[in-house]
Design a protein with these regions (language model features):
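Bacterial N-terminal signal peptides
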Residues: 8-19
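Sec/Tat signal peptide C-region and signal peptidase I cleavage site
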Residues: 20-24
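Short coil-to-beta-strand transition motifs
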Residues: 31-39
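Short aromatic-glycine-enriched beta-strand elements
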Residues: 49-60
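Short nucleic-acid-contacting surface segments enriched for D/E, G, S/T with interspersed K/R
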Residues: 81-96
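OB-fold/S1-family single-stranded nucleic acid-binding modules
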Residues: 102-126
């Protein structure tokens, strides 16, 4: 009986330790969760795969310089349930994105809230924000 308790305690401790990196991976600490930014962008890439969908797009700054962005969405299974497909976006598409900006303004990695396609269709990301 004593060995069973020790084994169960060790198993529980191991599960807690193993789950910590997963929990850290899903943090939103890099993003300003109190701000929403909208941008008109041109899609340069779209990766519809696990663990998170990635949008790559370009914008221009006030001087006309091209800025390259990486935008993290939620997982493909969730997006599929709300209307996204791997063909939703393709390079060259011009859309509007709504994102949570990075806390560091020099980093062009943002968190997706939703997109508005050229035809006006709105697709949410449904990130747990």
């Amino acid at each position: 009986m004593r060995h069973t308790r020790i084994a169960l305690l060790a198993l529980a401790a191991g599960l807690v330790i193993i789950s910590l990196p997963v929990s850290a991976h899903h943090g939103n600490a890099a993003y300003d969760m109190d701000k929403t930014v909208s941008m008109k962008v041109t899609i340069t890439g779209f990766e519809f795969g696990n663990p998170h969908v990635q949008l790559f797009f370009d914008t221009k700054d006030d001087q006309g310089n091209v800025l390259h962005w990486n935008c993290e969405g939620t997982n493909p299974a969730m997006l599929t349930r709300i209307g996204w497909t791997r063909n939703t976006l393709k390079p060259g598409d011009q859309i509007t994105v709504f994102v949570r900006p990075n806390k560091n303004p020099d980093i062009t990695v943002v968190l997706l809230i939703k997109v508005v396609l050229a035809n006006g269709q709105v697709l949410e990301s449904r990130n747990p924000v």
